[in-house]
Amino acid sequence: MLANPFTPAFLTQLETLRLRTRKEFLGSHPGNYSSPRRGTSLEFADYRRYSPGDDLRYLDWGIYARTDRLYVKLFREEVDLFAYVFIDASASMGFPSREAKFFPASHVALALSYVILANHDHVKLHLLQDQSRLQDQSRASPFYRGRRRMTDCVSFATAAMPGGTLDLAASLNDHLQRLRRPGKAILISDFLMPAAAYQKGLNLLRSFNLDIAAIQVLARQEVEPVFPNGRLALVDSESQREIAYRWNSNARRDYQARLAHHNLELKSFCHQSGIHYSLYVNDRDLSDFIFATLPAIGLFK
């Protein structure tokens, strides 16, 4: 699964990236992200009046010379980041095959996980799927930290089998009830669901004070379907509902217009909600997506 494109050169390039976050979080170890707590990093935050016992090194003698009052400088504390990567593992992520869609989605998740691990931050992987299909221990990984835990991330993602239906908000809520730390949430899905369904799920993530990115993964066959002209029996991969449909050039244009409108609604909702959004089609080079597109939308520093 990781033979290509996870080459040593690709991993080395991933180590040059760092997630960008729009929020401030409280971490458990010193790290690279701003915290609302006051600390001793080099990023100046504010002043306050001197109190006995304060470190004299942080007295601002310039203010003292002007006001004859003692003030100490305050700095933002830099802390580590907790990142939650949610991967849609419903049946639609297995269309047209697990290798063609779920694997590319997993590759995106694993590339982002490696960036997080290489910065010595914490990452936790979550599978979004019908709860009846998953044991508690297979729904989410533990927190991983450090590059050596990449093999654990790979093992977790490789073991997943897409299947079943997905109620996005309900599945997210099941995971979020166990969440104890705010941080960065990255949701990877095809988002092929009614607008009300993905909006409810994304709003739920927002309610947990998470900085959110939404990455939509589609197969080329979904973007540009190739079917013989004539009558077709189309089967919903999740509900198994079947409909008869007559396919021709007009039907193709109508389908592509509807998909483009759906994707534009998703993108607009994300932008209005302060959520990073990007579309990844499975035949695109992963390296180009990671190193060109994701920095362009502000996901990386």
Where on the chain are the PLM-derived regions?
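Von Willebrand factor type A / integrin I
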Residues: 1-36, 177-183, 195, 199-301
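Conserved phosphate-coordination/catalytic loops
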Residues: 103, 162-169, 192, 257-260
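Short, contiguous clusters of charged residues that form electrostatic/catalytic patches at enzyme active sites
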Residues: 107, 111, 166-173, 196, ...
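Short amphipathic beta-strand/extended segments with alternating polar/hydrophobic composition
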Residues: 139-146, 243-248
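Short, electropositive alpha-helical surface patch
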Residues: 142-156, 295-296
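Thr-Gly-centered strand-to-loop micro-motif
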Residues: 156, 188-189
